[in-house]
Amino acid sequence: MNKRVKIVATLGPAVEIRGGKKFGEDGYWSEKLDCEASAKNIAQLIKEGANVFRFNFSHGDHAEQGERMDVVRMAEDLAGQKVGFLLDTKGPEIRTELFEGDAKEYAYKTGEQIRVATKQGIKSTRDVIALNVAGALDVFDDVEVGKQVLVDDGKLGLRVVDKDAEKREFIVEVENDGIIAKQKGVNIPNTKIPFPALAERDNDDIRFGLEQGLNFIAISFVRTAKDVQEVRAICEETGNGHVKLLAKIENQQGIENIDSIIEAADGIMIARGDMGIEVPFEMVPVYQKMIITKVNAAGKIAVTATNMLETMTDKPRATRSEVSDVFNAVIDGTDATMLSGESANGKYPVESVRTMATIDKNAQTLLKEYGRLDSSTFGRSSKTEVVASAVKDATNSMDIKLVVALTESGNTARLISKYRPEADILAVTFDEITQKSLMLNWGVIPVVTEKPASTDDMFDVAEKVALHSGLVESGDNIVIVAGVPVGTGGTNTMRIRTVK
């Protein structure tokens, strides 16, 4: 059995070589990127099980990210395997401003009172911490007395005790000993802030990524379906309507609007880092299970992300609780699990991918016994859906080694994946765009071949591609799914065939 759960690995300096130096060595950043050596490292990640690489546009400029994408293309050639490219937007966020003078950080004690300035374009001092808000918004009127302000992923908590309308400042009380450094993330839980759906920087980043031929966009801090629709409009305007959009759910508003967001997006990324700050932490696993269940029912992509193997940023082995976390995400029904800092700037990127692949593969063998997916509740709303359901029944009741789905758009393979058949799904596509769009779908192994000329050719091509893949051998039973006649645009045929 192949690994059916996909792995998203975030790229960064952890796998990049500069002037013969590894990340963390003196003078690393002053050296030029060694593309060939870096490509070898990334190829190793592919061989260990990485299916999609995430380019985090919260860090680095277009030149750096573009060079990184070029290196991944080199790595594809070295590994002899295609991967997906995912752009993760910076999104609308709040950060602490730069400090006056040479200060890098300020330390605070529990019970201290300081001020937080919401007026834009000023620098921070020890007594007045200024906020840099996406879209240059002044959030003074949006935050009520009694609200909590969390800095640097919640490492320091501040409580608003009063407001100074004249200066546009909050008076806050420090809730725990801690440090505030420049340009650290700020969260204000249970507060609706009227961010623009798409910041100017995100617009520029998305257009750049589309020019580079990316396959997926993860849209940060999605609150409503409109946020997804704005990105979709850019993709369609630039002739990139095929790019798949993942809505990152990171706050209460996104959770409240989850049904309409799922309908608008191609998938959901459950970004548990910011979510765990924006909502009560004990609700994060509840929301994870709820969202995955809804996404599964819609036949879309579910990606579970953030802190999955966090310990492996610094240590060669995961904790038992991290192993359980990854395992349970698979049992919940996730299509993909994601590595962030572990593969981007950690000490053990290769080991992190290998560990995640091992857990994913073990968990998928127990889906039938412990999995939460109940396909009997899915609606059969189309001929293709009926065929996809029949494919699962066939793999459950017969000795079927492989499902072969001939698909122009990829939709046939996606629907079959939705039902989680008991066999791998070989998606036979006719162009690389469709092939790469399937890199996140559970159980799908996408390949490219020439389009068959006739219906008879179609089934012969399916068998030949299956044999060539090494997934079956002579005498094995396969299920072939296709649309007849060729090019009809719909799936209406399922044929069980013994490989000759």
Predicted segments — roles?
Residues 1-500:
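Non-catalytic helical/linker scaffolds that mediate oligomerization, partner binding
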